[in-house]
Curated annotation (Swiss-Prot):
Cellular location(s): Cytoplasm; Melanosome
Post-translational modifications: The delta, brain-specific form differs from the zeta form in being phosphorylated. Phosphorylation on Ser-184 by MAPK8; promotes dissociation of BAX and translocation of BAX to mitochondria. Phosphorylation on Thr-232; inhibits binding of RAF1. Phosphorylated on Ser-58 by PKA and protein kinase C delta type catalytic subunit in a sphingosine-dependent fashion. Phosphorylation on Ser-58 by PKA; disrupts homodimerization and heterodimerization with YHAE and TP53.
Residues bearing PTM N6-acetyllysine: K3, K68
Assigned GO CC terms: cytosol; glutamatergic synapse; hippocampal mossy fiber to CA3 synapse; melanosome; mitochondrion; nucleus
Species for this entry: Mus musculus (Mouse)
Record site: Interaction with phosphoserine on interacting protein: R56, R127
Protein name (database record): 14-3-3 protein zeta/delta
Entries under PANTHER family matching the protein: 14-3-3 PROTEIN (PTHR18860)
Gene3D superfamilies from the UniProt entry: 14-3-3 domain
Keyword Hydrolase recorded: no
Residues bearing PTM Phosphoserine: S58, S184, S207, S210
InterPro entries: 14-3-3, 14-3-3_CS, 14-3-3_dom_sf, 14-3-3_domain
Length: 245
């Protein structure tokens, strides 16, 4: 199938909410080796975000059931095996995306904006791996995530307006990484607050086409800050989960 047909099919799959098909189409487009247009880049991102999102959500539900069935040996074993099956799917999806990023997307990114977008994506998918990692593996995965976010963060500060939706989305997800993966609420709050304040200070630089995206992410940054600064014990597990880009 040629590139245009694959992109058309991906859009059709998106409308049908068949995200596995959508991801497969955009994976094929990426493997053709040319740099993706903004539209193609967004299709790829939306497809995999939905594909991995379904597994992350299932994993959280089954993990919680597994913890609650302590003492009921049979039920707990069934939940554990099911969680492990979901984990395998989740890892395969993340490794798929990370391999596309390493082989094609990051090396081919000619603009700072694309580079930041793909490095953020790399940080995100290592973060999803970190959520289900245990033991010796975990530290290496967490480091990979942090390095990708950090590199993206430095480029974004140098090359993009504080109101740019990609720069804001990166700050949002990097702060969630600090809060949830590194358990550093102070660092998470400081990063989110700085990003929010810098964007507010330059609201007049907001372009018409990104106005909606930017203000939505600013709202998410503020929601997370509210949640994290109250930091009540009961909110711990959920904090930041709604607030991701």
């Amino acid at each position: 199938m040629d590139k245009n047909e694959l992109v058309q099919k991906a859009k059709l799959a998106e409308q049908a909410e068949r995200y596995d098909d959508m991801a497969a189409c955009m994976k094929s487009v990426t493997e053709q080796g040319a740099e993706l247009s903004n539209e193609e880049r967004n299709l790829l991102s939306v497809a995999y975000k939905n594909v991995v999102g379904a597994r992350r959500s299932s994993w959280r539900v089954v993990s919680s059931i597994e913890q609650k069935t302590e003492g009921a040996e049979k039920k707990q074993q069934m939940a554990r095996e099911y969680r492990e099956k979901i984990e395998t799917e989740l890892r395969d999806i993340c490794n798929d995306v990370l391999s596309l990023l390493e082989k094609f997307l990051i090396p081919n990114a000619s603009q700072p904006e694309s580079k930041v977008f793909y490095l953020k994506m790399k940080g995100d998918y290592y973060r999803y791996l970190a959520e289900v990692a245990a033991g010796d593996d975990k530290k290496g995965i967490v480091d990979q995530s942090q390095q990708a976010y950090q590199e993206a963060f430095e480029i974004s500060k140098k090359e993009m307006q504080p109101t740019h939706p990609i720069r804001l989305g990166l700050a949002l997800n990097f702060s969630v990484f600090y809060y949830e993966i590194l358990n550093s609420p102070e660092k998470a709050c400081s990063l989110a607050k700085t990003a929010f304040d810098e964007a507010i200070a330059e609201l007049d630089t907001l372009s018409e086409e990104s106005y909606k995206d930017s203000t939505l992410i600013m709202q998410l940054l503020r929601d997370n800050l509210t949640l994290w600064t109250s930091d009540t014990q009961g909110d711990e597990a959920e904090a930041g989960e709604g607030g991701e880009n």
